[in-house]
């Protein structure tokens, strides 16, 4: 912080002088002064220096004002400021709420020098509510970083692409705008007007503004960055930002290239030079800057030079300055970097001060080293001072307690001594308590031209080291008697050393045992012990003082060793020694030992020290091979790849690979996979290599032992992205804090977790190759509890020695699992020198025809039309055969399928077909193994004779049915009479009912009554057909006119549904049945029935005309690339909310009418002329969108992509299952009617949803709609909301007309009476939803095998769904006949 302040203070006088020179040249283009860069902090005092500034030549930093309040800024405004040449930084300025008054005319930020790649930084401005830089038109270089501003809004309304050339590197996060809490209102919006220009970003066509009162200025595209006038006319090509007149370079607000004498120019003509990348100056201007800096000798100023037609602060790399003309000339060889020291000397008292001399080769002045502490000093000093080759003055080392050696001056070769310390000293060393070495004189050469040496009070620096320096530096004989103190230098060091020799060395893989010769000083009591030093040394170039300083930084490991017991007999004297433990295998260590002795009375210190020796530990077992990956490229081969061990612990010579075939689980033989609901087992072979990390499985979640969903570790890409994001933020903050004050310590955290949810499934499939490290075993244990019996030869392990990191294993059985063991070895013979094993499982690919049935299919025909089919099993299938599929058909009929389990096949040696009708049959069979289906056999033909041909059966055939018909008639008549008495006909007469007639086929309707015309009947003459609209379920749908069909309207546009002329009676009844269902519906958000024409042919049903067709087609037409796009943009959030509420209101009405839709989808919703969405007429769309349906087994078509899990699994349809479908409709609205679960087949969707899956969030989906979807897709039906609750959630954001027409706000929407809730189940009315006669109801209720499809509806619909902790009480049970294929 202090450093930055000093630099700014030093540079200010020079730049103020520059500003004065430019005042006359500024002209009208810049109305004020050119000011130097400013750092304004702590208070507002210096802010007034901006008052007359038009250009800030440098940066503007406003920061660290914690006591300012909003009223302090109200009278502050600097309208003259137009351009900042570097960057603008605002950081922790309290009370500042907007910049609109502070810098109302700031137009350009050039970004010549950036703040961490950013030209505009707004960081931790706690009170800033808006930027307000409404005249900012151009940021020439750099990006924008706006972060951690808790009150900052109006960010989404700024189109940064109009200000910057590229917005990809912008970083705008963690502001109030991120939380969607901002109510950004552009000028005119509150009054319903559009005053500001609108642009498209990320598909959003939005107005652009800086504040509620200032629009963002958007120039025509052809103007590019030149700007435009207030009328929108383009400025001159040399302008930047704005201008007052078009096509005039003297009327620009700022210049695109350079400014010269009141006009903008492309380049500076001679004799002018480019200065600061924006203006032109002459030679005298640049020369004045050079001389003023040189003469002032102030820190932080620059001695400007001329290079490439530019006036720049210093010569670039590879050039040096010619002092006569200030020109930069190329260097001959390496360029010296001369650093001129202010006041002739510089004191290095910290790493920070040393950094200021980084890169210097010549010091023009004297250096004083006075370092008393610090971290990692030796390395830091070498990095910053290691290139210094020459010092013109003197070198003084004073009270530097942290220094052990001067070897960090690794290139210092000359001390000139042009300036000497008092007493004529050019090298001065005083009171350095830990200095032990000057330089390694065997490798270093130093010359001192003038001056003497001074050494006093360096207690650990031996005199021999000083005398060696005298000889090398050429100063011997210059010193006087008292210049080198004999008593205070080296008085605490072992300077008269003897050489210790090692007598015994023994190694193992993690230990080294050392012994050395005994040593005793003249007084043996002076020996305190030995010090053993060792460290890893890949190369034999280590010196004793490498990396050492006196503050604890030491690259050596030091061990203190007590002296041995002294013996009077030298021959029996024990040799001291030490066992070094915990070493790394196969690693070279540098080792030396020296004595630790006391200070002697004779001022002489004795001691001994060994030379540095190098010892390597032995090899041992390597660590496990890394990342083994297996793939199968054929049915008989597996490719194995791996990486070398992380710790080879020796030279890896080879790898051992073992593999063994794994038996399939015999339990698979015992199960009957033809049973409904039993999942077919499957196995997959090892997939091809995708990357080196393909063995890692990046599932989003897994199930634990209790079957509960657990979060999985994040994928490598997620972790890498989070680490990069965290590192990026930390690096920026460190950079910011380094510039602003002091660098903070790096946090030990791993970074913030991503709060966004990353998973969409509640369950997980099987996992593929998994690698684990286990101890080596001689034979592989069998992992299956029970196995298919196979010969021991097939399962014997195989072994192979490999000399590289890959292997192709051949000769394997097709589609068979193998377990592979991999060991790394670093020696040829002993087995114990190999690593523990890494295991990987793999499976070969299936054989193409291995599952084909061998030989012909034979048959045998028995009585009662039973046929026994027989065939042979595949000889060598892919894994196991789990079932057989038999496909047979009678000539002229549909093909039928029969599943035969393996257990059943083993008993029958085939299967039996029973109850066959007479005729010619063909049959095909295929086997299903763990790998999938085999091929069908060739068809086999047989003939079943007519059962009537047997005379003895004629009587049974005739008499039996007669008895059955008689009994059946009696039962039906009794039931009919009973129900007739208990329940009179409804007001609409007999009724065929269906909860969704689309899935009730004609075969389910017993036609014992006909349609009876009523008040809905319309005369055929009143209907006029105009044009075809499309094909419906029963026939064509037309647009037409109807006269007098609605009271008060002479003629009404309607939709007319017809039935095909070839339709059967049952189809016509079903057609009218649909119309009858619609008669009971009178809701604005449900398509209305207007009338029926049942007299004559064809039958017509007249409906309300929905001008924009079905919702699915309408949404697709809104896609930008759609050919039939009506010119409307995609729906906004407000329009999505309106659609959702209208659909929910219609469904709430149907629910109140005890109607379960069962096929709610966008295709079944219709769009009216005023864009109101209504629930469709339940019959127009299934044939049109037939691909949206799926036939499951022998059932009718099912819309599986819209169905709830309980409907798919158990056939249960309730209002809760309709709510699930409503969530899918919301998904269709936000995705513009994409197909749900795109890329999955219907069978995959079926399994995915039943297993707990649901749809991903569409791109750019509003968070509010996403929340609604998730509410609808609760796996537990009881936890889903009701449609009334949905409308209640959205009611405050709907069109004002909604309450006038909605069911939600109507009198009809009332809670049921309390006595109705007390009904017992026996007393409840069984209400089928198909309008049918009573006889049809009775038959449906008593039909054999007619499994009913039940659903519940709660009367407690006004209780929020989040409180439904138990089952729904007092529910009404309604039974329906199961739908059959239509």
Curated annotation (Swiss-Prot):
Effect of residue 393 to R: In LEPRCH; Verona-1
Glycosylation sites recorded in the entry for this protein: 43, 52, 105, 138, 242, 282, 322, 364, 424, 445, 541, 633, 651, 698, 769, 782, 920, 933
Regulation: Activated in response to insulin. Autophosphorylation activates the kinase activity. PTPN1, PTPRE and PTPRF dephosphorylate important tyrosine residues, thereby reducing INSR activity. Inhibited by ENPP1. GRB10 and GRB14 inhibit the catalytic activity of the INSR, they block access of substrates to the activated receptor. SOCS1 and SOCS3 act as negative regulators of INSR activity, they bind to the activated INRS and interfere with the phosphorylation of INSR substrates.
Membrane topology listed for this record: Single-pass type I membrane protein
Post-translational modification (record): After being transported from the endoplasmic reticulum to the Golgi apparatus, the single glycosylated precursor is further glycosylated and then cleaved, followed by its transport to the plasma membrane. Autophosphorylated on tyrosine residues in response to insulin. Phosphorylation of Tyr-999 is required for binding to IRS1, SHC1 and STAT5B. Dephosphorylated by PTPRE at Tyr-999, Tyr-1185, Tyr-1189 and Tyr-1190. May also be phosphorylated at Tyr-1185 and Tyr-1190 by mTORC2. Dephosphorylated by PTPRF and PTPN1. Dephosphorylated by PTPN2; down-regulates insulin-induced signaling. Dephosphorylation at Tyr-1189 and Tyr-1190 requires the SH2/SH3 adapter protein NCK1, probably to recruit its interaction partner PTPN1.
Transmembrane segments: 957-979
UniProt region (Important for interaction with IRS1, SHC1 and STAT5B), positions on chain: 999
Disease connection: Rabson-Mendenhall syndrome: Severe insulin resistance syndrome characterized by insulin-resistant diabetes mellitus with pineal hyperplasia and somatic abnormalities. Typical features include coarse, senile-appearing facies, dental and skin abnormalities, abdominal distension, and phallic enlargement. Inheritance is autosomal recessive. Leprechaunism: Represents the most severe form of insulin resistance syndrome, characterized by intrauterine and postnatal growth retardation and death in early infancy. Inheritance is autosomal recessive.
Domain remark text: The tetrameric insulin receptor binds insulin via non-identical regions from two alpha chains, primarily via the C-terminal region of the first INSR alpha chain. Residues from the leucine-rich N-terminus of the other INSR alpha chain also contribute to this insulin binding site. A secondary insulin-binding site is formed by residues at the junction of fibronectin type-III domain 1 and 2.
Protein's job: Receptor tyrosine kinase which mediates the pleiotropic actions of insulin. Binding of insulin leads to phosphorylation of several intracellular substrates, including, insulin receptor substrates (IRS1, 2, 3, 4), SHC, GAB1, CBL and other signaling intermediates. Each of these phosphorylated proteins serve as docking proteins for other signaling proteins that contain Src-homology-2 domains (SH2 domain) that specifically recognize different phosphotyrosine residues, including the p85 regulatory subunit of PI3K and SHP2.
Listed name of the protein: Insulin receptor
Species per Swiss-Prot/TrEMBL record: Homo sapiens (Human)
Lineage of the species this protein comes from: Eukaryota, Metazoa, Chordata, Craniata, Vertebrata
């Amino acid at each position: 912080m202090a450093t930055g302040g000093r630099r700014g203070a030093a540079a200010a006088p020079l730049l103020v002088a520059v500003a004065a020179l430019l005042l006359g040249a500024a002209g009208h283009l810049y109305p004020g002064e050119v000011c130097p860069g400013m750092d304004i902090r702590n208070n507002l005092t210096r802010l007034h220096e901006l008052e007359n500034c038009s250009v800030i030549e440098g940066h503007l930093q406003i920061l660290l004002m914690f006591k300012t309040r909003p009223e302090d800024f109200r009278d502050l405004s600097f309208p003259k400021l137009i351009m900042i040449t570097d960057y603008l930084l605002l950081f922790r300025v309290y009370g500042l709420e907007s910049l609109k008054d502070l810098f109302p005319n700031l137009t350009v930020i050039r970004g010549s020098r950036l703040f961490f790649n950013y030209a505009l930084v707004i960081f931790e401005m706690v009170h800033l509510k808006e930027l307000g830089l409404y005249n900012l038109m151009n940021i020439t270089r750099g990006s924008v970083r706006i972060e951690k501003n808790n009150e900052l809004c109006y960010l989404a309304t700024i189109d940064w692409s109009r200000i910057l050339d590229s917005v990809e590197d912008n970083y705008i996060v963690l502001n109030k705008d991120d939380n969607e809490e901002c109510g950004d209102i552009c000028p005119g919006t509150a009054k319903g007007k559009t005053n500001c220009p609108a642009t498209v970003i990320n598909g959003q066509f939005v107005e652009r503004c800086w504040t509620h009162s200032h629009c963002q200025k958007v120039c025509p595209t052809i103007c590019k960055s030149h700007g435009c006038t207030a009328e929108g006319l383009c400025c001159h090509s040399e302008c930047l930002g704005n201008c007052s007149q078009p096509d005039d370079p003297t009327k620009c607000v700022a210049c695109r290239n350079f400014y010269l004498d009141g006009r903008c120019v492309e380049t500076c003509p001679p004799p002018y030079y480019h200065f600061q990348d924006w203006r032109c100056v002459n030679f005298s201007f640049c020369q004045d800057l050079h001389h003023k800096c040189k003469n002032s000798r102030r820190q932080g100023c620059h001695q400007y030079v001329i290079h490439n037609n530019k006036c720049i602060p210093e010569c670039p790399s590879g050039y040096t300055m010619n002092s006569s003309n200030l020109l930069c000339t190329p260097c001959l060889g390496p360029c010296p970097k001369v650093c001129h020291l202010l006041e002739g000397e510089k004191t290095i008292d910290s790493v920070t001060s040393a950094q200021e001399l980084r890169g210097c080769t010549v010091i023009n002045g004297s250096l004083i080293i006075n370092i008393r502490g610090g971290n990692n000093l030796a390395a830091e000093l070498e990095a910053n001072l290691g290139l210094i080759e020459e010092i013109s003055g003197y070198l003084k080392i004073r009270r530097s307690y942290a220094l052990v050696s001067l070897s960090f001056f690794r290139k210092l070769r000359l001390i000139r001594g042009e300036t000497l310390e008092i007493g004529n000293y050019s090298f001065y060393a005083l009171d350095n308590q830990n200095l032990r070495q000057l330089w390694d004189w065997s490798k270093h050469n130093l010359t001192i031209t003038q001056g003497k040496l001074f050494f006093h009070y360096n207690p650990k620096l031996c005199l021999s080291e000083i005398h060696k320096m005298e000889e090398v530096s050429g100063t011997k004989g210059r010193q006087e008697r008292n210049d080198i103190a004999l008593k205070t230098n080296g008085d605490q060091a072992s300077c008269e050393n003897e050489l210790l020799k090692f007598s015994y060395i023994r190694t193992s893989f993690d230990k080294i045992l050392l012994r050395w010769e005994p040593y005793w000083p003249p007084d043996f009591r002076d020996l305190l012990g030995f010090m053993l030093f060792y460290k890893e040394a890949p190369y034999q170039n280590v010196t004793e003082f490498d990396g050492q300083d006196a503050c604890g930084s030491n690259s050596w490991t030091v061990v203190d060793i007590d002296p041995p017991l002294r013996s009077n007999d030298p021959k029996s004297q024990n040799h001291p020694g030490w066992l070094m433990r915990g070493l790394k295998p196969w690693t070279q260590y540098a080792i030396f030992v020296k004595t630790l002795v006391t200070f002697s009375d004779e001022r002489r210190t004795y001691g001994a020290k060994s030379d540095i020796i190098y010892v390597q530990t032995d090899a041992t077992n390597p660590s496990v091979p890394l990342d083994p990956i297996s793939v199968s490229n054929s049915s008989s081969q597996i490719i194995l790849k791996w990486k070398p061990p992380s710790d080879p612990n020796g030279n890896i010579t080879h790898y051992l690979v073992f593999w063994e075939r794994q038996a399939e689980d015999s339990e698979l033989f015992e199960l009957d996979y033809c049973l409904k609901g039993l999942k077919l087992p499957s196995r997959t072979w090892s997939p091809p290599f995708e990357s080196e990390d393909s063995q890692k499985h990046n599932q989003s979640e897994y199930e634990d032992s209790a079957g509960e969903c657990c979060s999985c570790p994040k994928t490598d890409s997620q972790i890498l992205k989070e680490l990069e994001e965290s590192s990026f933020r930390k690096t920026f903050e460190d950079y910011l804090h380094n510039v602003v004050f002091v660098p903070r310590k790096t946090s030990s955290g791993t970074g913030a977790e991503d709060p966004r949810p990353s998973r969409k499934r509640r369950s997980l499939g099987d996992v593929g190759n998994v690698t684990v490290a286990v101890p080596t075993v001689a034979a592989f244990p069998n992992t299956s509890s029970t196995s298919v019996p196979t010969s021991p030869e097939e399962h014997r392990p195989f072994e192979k020695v490999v000399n590289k990191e890959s292997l192709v294993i051949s000769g394997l059985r097709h589609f068979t699992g193998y377990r592979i063991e991999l060991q790394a070895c670093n020696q040829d013979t002993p087995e114990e020198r190999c690593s523990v094993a890494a295991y990987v499982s793999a499976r070969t690919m299936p054989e193409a025809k291995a599952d084909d049935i061998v030989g012909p299919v034979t048959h045998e025909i028995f009585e009662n039309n039973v046929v026994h089919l027989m065939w042979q099993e595949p000889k060598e299938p892919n894994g196991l055969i789990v079932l057989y599929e038999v496909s047979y058909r009678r000539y002229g009929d549909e093909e039928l399928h029969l599943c035969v389990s393996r257990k059943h096949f083993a008993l029958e040696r085939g299967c039996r077909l029973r109850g066959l009708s007479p005729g010619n049959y063909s049959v095909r069979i295929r086997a299903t193994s763990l790998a999938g289906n085999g091929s069908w056999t060739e068809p086999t033909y047989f003939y079943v004779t007519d059962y009537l041909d047997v005379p003895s059966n004629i009587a049974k055939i005739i008499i039996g049915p007669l008895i059955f018909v008689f009994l059946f008639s009696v039962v039906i008549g009794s039931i009919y009479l009973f129900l007739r008495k208990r329940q009179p006909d409804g007001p609409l007469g007999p009724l065929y009912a269906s909860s969704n007639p689309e899935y009730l086929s004609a075969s389910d309707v017993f036609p014992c009554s006909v349609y009876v015309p009523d008040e809905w009947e319309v005369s055929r003459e009143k209907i006029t057909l105009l044009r075809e609209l499309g094909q419906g379920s029963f026939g064509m749908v037309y647009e037409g006119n109807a006269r007098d069909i609605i009271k008060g309207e002479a003629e009404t546009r309607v939709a007319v549904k017809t039935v095909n002329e070839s339709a059967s009676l049952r189809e016509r009844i079903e057609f009218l049945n649909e119309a009858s269902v619609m008669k009971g519906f009178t809701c604005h958000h449900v398509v209305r029935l207007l009338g029926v024409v049942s007299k004559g042919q064809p039958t017509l049903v007249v409906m309300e005309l929905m001008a924009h067709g079905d919702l699915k087609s309408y949404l697709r037409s809104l896609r930008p690339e759609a050919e039939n796009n009506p010119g409307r943009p995609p729906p906004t959030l407000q329009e999505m909310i309106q659609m959702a509420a209208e659909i929910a209101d219609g469904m709430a009405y149907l629910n109140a009418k005890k109607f379960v839709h069962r096929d709610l989808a966008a295709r079944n919703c219709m769009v009216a002329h005023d864009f109101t969405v209504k629930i469709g007429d339940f019959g127009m769309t299934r044939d049109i969108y037939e691909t949206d349906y799926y036939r499951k087994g022998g059932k009718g078509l099912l819309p599986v992509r819209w169905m709830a899990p309980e409907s798919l699994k158990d056939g249960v349809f309730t209002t809760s299952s309709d709510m699930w479908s409503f969530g899918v409709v919301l998904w269709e609205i936000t995705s513009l009617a994409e197909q749900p679960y795109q890329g999955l087949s219907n069978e995959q969707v079926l399994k995915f949803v039943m297993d707990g899956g649901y749809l991903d969030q569409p791109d750019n989906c509003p968070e509010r709609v996403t929340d609604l979807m998730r509410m609808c897709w609760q796996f537990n039906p009881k936890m889903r909301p009701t449609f009334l609750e949905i409308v209640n959630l959205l009611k405050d954001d709907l069109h004002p007309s909604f309450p006038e027409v909605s069911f939600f706000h109507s009198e009809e929407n009332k809670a049921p009476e309390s006595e109705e809730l007390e009904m017992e189940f026996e007393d409840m009315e069984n209400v089928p939803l198909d309008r049918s006669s009573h006889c049809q109801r009775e038959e449906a209720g008593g039909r054999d095998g007619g499994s009913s499809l039940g659903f519940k509806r709660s009367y407690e619909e006004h209780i929020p769904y989040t409180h439904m902790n138990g089952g729904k009480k007092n529910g009404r049970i309604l039974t329906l006949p199961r739908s059959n294929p239509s």
